[in-house]
Structure formats: C-alpha cells, structure tokens
Design a protein with these regions (language model features):
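Short, surface-exposed loop/turn motifs with a glycine/proline- and acidic-biased composition
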Residues: 77-113
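Surface-exposed loop/turn motifs at beta-strand-loop junctions within extracellular Ig-like
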Residues: 11, 21, 67, 94, ...
Length: 124
C-alpha cells in the first residue's frame, strides 16, 4: 500500500482524512445496524483485491492479512473509525513490498468487541 494523505468533505461539510491507505469512506449513508465483514473481491485475485465492512459505531479498528500459518503479512488499516461503510484495496504485497506466494490467506477485521476472519486466495 502506498503512503498517501487525502482529505475530503462530505455533504455536511465534515472533513474526512485518509492517511497511508487507499480506501473509500461512505459517511453519508445510514449507519449500519451491525458489524459486517464482506468477502473480498475479486477472489481469487492477482494482484489487487478489495475489502469492505460495516461499522455500526465508532471504534478502534484493525484489518490485517495473515498467511496460512497465522503470520501477519500486512495491516490494511489500524486506527480509529466512525460508524459507516468502508472499502479498502490491497495491492497483494507483503508489508516489506514483496509479493507473497500463491495460496490461501486470511483477513481479519477487529473492531471493539467484534472479530471476524475470512479466507481468500492469491494466484499468480
């Protein structure tokens, strides 16, 4: 993931700042009623995939990719987010900048007391 800084305003004139991520935040929609981690797409993928999730309330959020042995590959997001729908993309690279081997990987969303993990497949 490339480092970046982006600022936007929503229809209410509120500033939204994204730092170090490529993602989209949909703040103007009605707040979700529950936490939801959606299946990444495309899946299988090479080299880019997208992650999306719903947060019903503000909280500290991590979105992390792990290999089949449970080793952390990269952190897609690590910080505070308000309630809403979020979408992030991943270029398929290890945090060191290298491409992981083809195979099964897992991504995990943790937010407040919610934790969910899903499976994905990298192909080359």
């Amino acid at each position: 993931i490339e480092n970046s800084l982006e600022a936007k305003t929503n229809s209410l004139g509120q500033f939204i700042v994204l730092s170090g991520i490529h993602g989209e935040i949909y703040k103007d929609l009605v707040l979700p009623k529950q936490y939801t981690l959606f299946q990444n797409y495309p899946n299988p993928f090479n080299p880019v995939t997208n992650f999306a999730f719903d947060l019903p309330e503000q909280g500290y959020v991590t979105l992390v990719v792990y290999d089949i042995m449970g080793r952390e590959i990269t952190r897609i997001f690590d910080g505070d987010l308000g309630g809403g729908y979020y979408k992030f993309n991943w270029d398929g690279k290890h945090r060191s900048g290298t491409m992981p081997a083809s195979g099964v990987y897992f991504y995990q969303l943790t937010a407040n007391d919610f934790r969910q993990t899903k499976k994905m497949l990298i192909i080359k």
